[in-house]
């Protein structure tokens, strides 16, 4: 082809690719804005919402002309430029006025710190809570709050480690490094046990009565060894047909056998396994596990070790300002565009009428904010805090949609955002974290034979309750300063005062077969617990006087439990088949699943009431995740085989999440939004099972509606909070013990023909106890003094005398039911188990708020309870 013909073809192609429409024409015409936009005098288009909002968004200020002048409210601070910001934003270390006048030194140096606050120095405008002084963290921007603090002095019953840390004297010479520097185990004499004690191989001492009782109390199990007892320990646990029993006694799902991931405590599920190979459609991770091949190089870490995302090639190589993608698909360097050389097959890199033309000179290219001229064409861009909504117009970015952008409260502003803290918290300007005001928060956790506490600031590490048997679950009533825990060996729930130096504790609830977790309702003063043996969830008053099953069906392996009495909901995890997390009203109504997918072994759950989220640990997936309280907006916080080897329980406070790992025998902490800032708080634990944060802000105060108008809400037995679904939801309902139903008045209880008792099949004799209410709720052993009552059987003559009267009553009731059915045969209705929910003609869900009595809260029908004694026998 000749040179002239080649150039003719080049011109023809260039004309074909030339743009046929442009927002800004060469003649200088202004582009017309859409109906949802405002056109500035200079021709630019901005969103209509920005008209007369106090900010000049048009470069010529025309969007703020002819606007009604706004006046600031009394609760606002007036900036020098006339802008209004809330008074609480003044002198908070964050400029909110566009001119920065809310943070001017003249204004802020005049500021006086409030009661319980201290100044960060004469040259600082910052005030911090008194409790933050000498807490080990720099809260003042100049660090003055951590100066001249002196050495920490340990109390008389504490030991001072070489590092200056305080630990309980009981931890000295116990064979464990509790100081983390080994100083508590220096110069220790050989340990000796008392005459009535047995010395474990680890040198610790246990009562002689605990030896050879088929319950390993020594951490090395030497009290149940073959050499000591002459036999192997008898394992009483019977696993369901869908599970297998580990050598260490616990049950796991059959499908977890030989899957490459040890799930038994002793690893026996991975012994004598054939060599594992992945299927052809699977990818083998470096740790040997298999994932579906489609998950490799998908941008998500599906392998725990992340090996599925290693050496992945970027499919789209045409990213960045230095690249140009041809319309025919090739990717070339931007330097080759408009160089009069064909680099794209279709010549799209050499458009004749677009090369080196600055479209931004006319009407800013139609861009509302920034116009960037390119070698070919142009592109619109936005200032920080804004994003393109239609390729030309900029709109505000809602930064509050990003998890963790604020510690607690996020307020979206035009072009930015503002972080605030909930009541009881204050912003730490050094970190941006909302820190609790008041006493030092601490972690309290079980350690099998004792309960321990570690401060989260000064790291003081002490023993709260000692000489326990097998503590597996823990919670607290913080306002009452009481601890509650469940002991697996003693099959009971106990309580103790957290400040009781004598170490006394009391049995509150007996006959708890296999407690998995407990949760204290600090508002209505009840306690909820899951029982892995009876497959039930129960509730009782804190003194144990009244109790009942809340759920005793559709539970396979109930595990962790958490309550939110402010909204009336209870949450629990179940690792049976299928594994799930559920929620329901704390009165037993409105039960529904929360998490049902991508979940296998949900061991621990906890609630973040400040951010309205639920966090859980999956011991099989080695993952920490969260959802909102409706089961939406699921996020993976951390996935780690190292730090989540076998996590058991977790708790949350401020911006940190803390958990116990059974395999590593340690307590860890991490950022609750990102999983970063991993830290080890405690090591060398002995079968730790549960953990809580102890601080008054963990349990926010709420109104006990059961004590609003009359005692116990007028209920004969239990008064339980109802789920607050909407503004018309009842505040509470009455509930009866097992074997009883509510009468029509919604307050009193009547007996059914099949009463339920809490008798145990082994080593426990139960007694029916007559309560002052006249109810017999089953064999409940409590610490309060009660009288044993025997009820003689009624004579047969009395039964024959009542029989004719009973037949007449049944005939009358039958006739009434037939008449009512005839009367309502044409009425269109929908019947539910809970009759307060009715179907309306508008297809909306409405709630009937009728009361049975003026003295009682709204009522639900009675819950039918079925005995589980046969299942437990």
UniProtKB/Swiss-Prot annotation:
Residues 31-69, 70-110, 111-151, 152-190, 191-231, 237-275, 276-314, 316-355 form the LDL-receptor class A domain. There is a cross-link at residue 839 (Glycyl lysine isopeptide (Lys-Gly) (interchain with G-Cter in ubiquitin)). It is a single-pass type I membrane protein. Disulfide bonds join 33-45, 40-58, 52-67, 72-84, 79-97, 91-108, 113-127, 120-140, 134-149, 154-166, 161-179, 173-188, 193-205, 200-218, 212-229, 239-251, 246-264, 258-273, 278-290, 285-303, 297-312, 318-331, 326-344, 338-355, 360-371, 367-380, 382-394, 400-410, 406-419, 421-434, 706-719, 715-734, 736-749. Pfam families: EGF_CA (PF07645), FXa_inhibition (PF14670), Ldl_recept_a (PF00057), Ldl_recept_b (PF00058). Glycans are attached at residues 151, 765, 781. GO terms for cellular component: clathrin-coated pit; extracellular space; glutamatergic synapse; membrane; receptor complex; synapse; very-low-density lipoprotein particle. Gene3D superfamilies: Laminin, Low-density Lipoprotein Receptor, TolB, C-terminal domain. It comes from the Eukaryota. Residues 820-873 are cytoplasmic. The chain crosses the membrane at residues 798-819. It is found in: Membrane; Membrane, Clathrin-coated pit. LDL-receptor class B repeats lie at residues 439-480, 481-524, 525-567, 568-611, 612-654, 655-697. InterPro entries: 6-blade_b-propeller_TolB-like, EGF-like_Ca-bd_dom, EGF-like_dom, EGF-type_Asp/Asn_hydroxyl_site, EGF_Ca-bd_CS, Growth_fac_rcpt_cys_sf, LDL_receptor-like_sf, LDLR-related. Abundant in heart and muscle; less in kidney, brain, ovary, testis, lung and adipose tissue. Strongly expressed in neurons. Residues 356-391, 396-431, 702-750 form the EGF-like domain. Residues 751-790 are annotated as: Clustered O-linked oligosaccharides. Keywords: Cholesterol metabolism, Coated pit, Disulfide bond, EGF-like domain, Endocytosis, Glycoprotein, Isopeptide bond, Lipid metabolism, Lipid transport, Membrane, Receptor, Repeat, Signal, Steroid metabolism, Sterol metabolism, Transmembrane, Transmembrane helix, Transport, Ubl conjugation, VLDL. One of its GO terms (molecular function) is reelin receptor activity. Its main location: membrane. PANTHER family: LOW-DENSITY LIPOPROTEIN RECEPTOR-RELATED (PTHR22722:SF15), LOW-DENSITY LIPOPROTEIN RECEPTOR-RELATED PROTEIN 2-RELATED (PTHR22722). Multifunctional cell surface receptor that binds VLDL and transports it into cells by endocytosis and therefore plays an important role in energy metabolism. Also binds to a wide range of other molecules including Reelin/RELN or apolipoprotein E/APOE-containing ligands as well as clusterin/CLU. In the off-state of the pathway LRP8 and VLDLR form homo or heterooligomers. Upon binding to ligands, homooligomers are rearranged to higher order receptor clusters that transmit the extracellular RELN signal to intracellular signaling processes by binding to DAB1 on its cytoplasmic tail. This is Very low-density lipoprotein receptor. The gene is Vldlr.
């Amino acid at each position: 082809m000749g040179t002239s013909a080649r150039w003719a073809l080049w011109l023809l192609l260039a004309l074909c690719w030339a743009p046929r429409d442009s927002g800004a024409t060469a003649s200088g015409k202004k582009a017309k804005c859409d109906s949802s936009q405002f056109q500035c005098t200079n021709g630019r288009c901005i969103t209509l919402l920005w008209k007369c909002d106090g900010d000049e968004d048009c470069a010529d200020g025309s969007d703020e002309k002819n606007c009604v002048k706004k006046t600031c409210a009394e609760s606002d601070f007036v900036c020098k430029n006339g802008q209004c910001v809330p008074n609480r934003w003044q002198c908070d270390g964050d400029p909110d006025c566009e001119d920065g006048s809310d943070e001017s030194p003249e204004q802020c140096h005049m500021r006086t710190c409030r009661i319980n606050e201290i100044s960060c120095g004469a040259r600082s405008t910052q005030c911090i809570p008194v409790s933050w002084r000498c807490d080990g963290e720099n809260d003042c921007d100049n660090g003055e709050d951590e100066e001249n603090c002196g050495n920490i002095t340990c109390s008389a019953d504490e030991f001072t480690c070489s590092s200056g840390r305080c630990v309980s004297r009981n931890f000295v010479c116990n064979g464990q490094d509790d100081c983390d520097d080994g100083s508590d185990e220096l110069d220790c004499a050989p340990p000796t046990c008392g005459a009535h004690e047995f010395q474990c191989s680890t040198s610790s001492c246990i009562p002689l009565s605990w030896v050879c009782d088929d319950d390993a109390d020594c951490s090395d199990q030497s009290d149940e060894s073959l050499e000591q007892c002459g036999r192997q320990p008898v394992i009483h646990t019977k696993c369901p047909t869908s599970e297998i029993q580990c050598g260490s006694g616990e049950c796991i799902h059959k499908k977890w056998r030989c899957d490459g991931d040890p799930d038994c405590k002793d690893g026996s599920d991975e012994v004598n396994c054939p060599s594992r190979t992945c299927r052809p459609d699977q990818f083998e991770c470096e740790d040997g596990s298999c994932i579906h091949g489609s998950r490799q190089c998908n941008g998500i870490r599906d392998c725990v070790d992340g090996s599925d995302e290693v050496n992945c090639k970027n499919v789209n190589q045409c990213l960045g300002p230095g690249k140009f993608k041809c319309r025919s698909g090739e990717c070339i360097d931007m330097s080759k565009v408009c160089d009069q050389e064909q680099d794209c097959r279709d010549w799209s890199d050499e458009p004749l009428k677009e090369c080196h033309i600055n479209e931004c000179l006319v009407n800013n290219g139609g861009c509302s904010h920034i116009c960037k001229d390119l070698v070919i064409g142009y592109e619109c861009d936005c200032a920080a805090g804004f994003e393109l909504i239609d390729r030309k117009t900029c709109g505000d970015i809602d930064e509050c949609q990003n998890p963790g952008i604020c510690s607690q409260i996020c307020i979206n502003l035009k072009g930015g955002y503002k972080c605030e803290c909930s009541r009881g918290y204050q912003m730490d300007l050094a970190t941006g974290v909302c820190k609790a005001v008041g006493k030092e928060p601490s972690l309290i956790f079980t350690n099998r034979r004792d309960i321990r506490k570690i401060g989260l600031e000064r790291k003081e590490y002490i023993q709260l309750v000692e000489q326990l048997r097998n503590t597996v679950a823990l919670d607290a009533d913080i306002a009452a300063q009481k601890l509650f825990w469940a002991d697996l060996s003693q099959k009971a729930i106990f309580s103790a005062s957290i400040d009781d130096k004598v170490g006394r504790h009391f049995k509150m609830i007996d006959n708890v077969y296999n407690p998995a977790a407990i949760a204290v309702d600090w508002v209505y003063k009840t306690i909820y617990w899951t029982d892995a043996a009876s497959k039930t969830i129960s509730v009782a008053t804190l003194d144990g006087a009244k109790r009942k099953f809340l759920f005793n069906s559709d539970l396979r392996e109930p595990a962790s439990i958490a309550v939110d009495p402010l909204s009336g909901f209870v949450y629990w995890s179940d690792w049976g088949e299928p594994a799930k997390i559920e929620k329901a009203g704390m009165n037993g109504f409105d039960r529904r699943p929360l998490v049902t997918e991508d979940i296998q072994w949900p061991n621990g759950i906890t609630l973040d009431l400040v951010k309205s989220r639920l966090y859980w640990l999956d011991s099989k997936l080695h993952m920490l995740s969260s959802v909102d309280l409706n089961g939406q907006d699921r996020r993976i916080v951390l996935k780690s085989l190292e730090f989540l080897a076998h996590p058991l329980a977790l708790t949350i406070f401020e911006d940190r999440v803390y958990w116990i790992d059974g395999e590593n025998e340690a307590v860890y902490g991490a950022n609750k939004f990102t999983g970063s800032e991993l830290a080890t708080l405690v090591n060398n634990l002995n079968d730790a099972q549960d953990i809580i944060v102890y601080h008054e802000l963990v349990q926010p105060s709420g109104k006990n509606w059961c004590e609003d108008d009359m005692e116990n809400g007028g209920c004969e037995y239990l008064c339980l909070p109802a789920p607050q679904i909407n503004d018309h939801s009842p505040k509470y309902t009455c509930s009866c013990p097992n074997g009883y139903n509510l009468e029509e008045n919604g307050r009193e209880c009547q007996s059914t023909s099949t009463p339920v008792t809490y008798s145990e099949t082994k080593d426990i004799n139960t007694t029916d106890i007559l309560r002052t209410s006249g109810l017999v709720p089953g064999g409940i052993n409590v610490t309060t003094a009660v009288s044993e009552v025997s009820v003689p059987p009624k004579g047969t003559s009395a039964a024959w005398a009542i029989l004719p009267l009973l037949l007449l009553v049944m005939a009358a009731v039958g006739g009434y039911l037939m008449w009512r059915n005839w009367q309502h045969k044409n009425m269109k209705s929908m019947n539910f188990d809970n009759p307060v929910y009715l179907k309306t003609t508008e297809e909306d869900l409405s709630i009937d708020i009728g009361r049975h009595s003026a003295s009682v809260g709204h009522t639900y029908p009675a819950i039918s309870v079925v005995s589980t004694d046969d299942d437990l026998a």
